[in-house]
């Protein structure tokens, strides 16, 4: 009986150590965004855009898709950087992937196209 109890305790202890994989991979998103917002230099803007692109291209979370708002944020930043068509296409991808954002993103697109 004592051996059975120890076996159950050991199995439950080992199984509780398993960590779950996050839904989305964020890589260095927070740091890149913070650094750019802190000092808005062209070099930091390029680094931030590279980080966003990496996040979009190499998504390794359990869902396997880009986090909500990422396409729109990347698209908006591209639009501000002068890559208007590419920026608008990413804003539209946000609507495709997350239809619940359509009202909000459509307003942003409408404002940008004025």
Task: State what each model feature region is.
Residues 21, 55-65:
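Flexible helix-coil transition and linker loops at the boundaries of alpha-helical arrays
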Residues 40-53:
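Helix-turn-helix repeat elements of alpha-solenoid scaffolds
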Residues 11-34:
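Bacterial Sec signal peptide processing site at the extreme N-terminus
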Residues 73-74:
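Structural register within alpha-helical repeat arrays
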């Amino acid at each position: 009986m004592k051996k059975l109890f120890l076996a159950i305790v050991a199995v439950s202890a080992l199984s509780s150590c398993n960590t779950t994989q996050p839904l989305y991979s964020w890589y260095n998103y927070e740091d890149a965004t913070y650094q750019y917002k802190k000092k808005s230099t062209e070099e930091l803007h390029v680094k931030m855009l590279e980080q966003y692109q990496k996040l979009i291209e190499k998504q390794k979370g359990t869902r396997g898709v880009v986090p909500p708002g990422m396409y729109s944020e990347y698209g908006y930043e591209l639009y501000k950087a002068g890559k208007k068509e590419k920026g608008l296409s990413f804003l539209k991808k946000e609507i495709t992937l997350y239809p619940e954002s359509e009202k909000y993103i459509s307003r942003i697109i409408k404002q940008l196209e004025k």
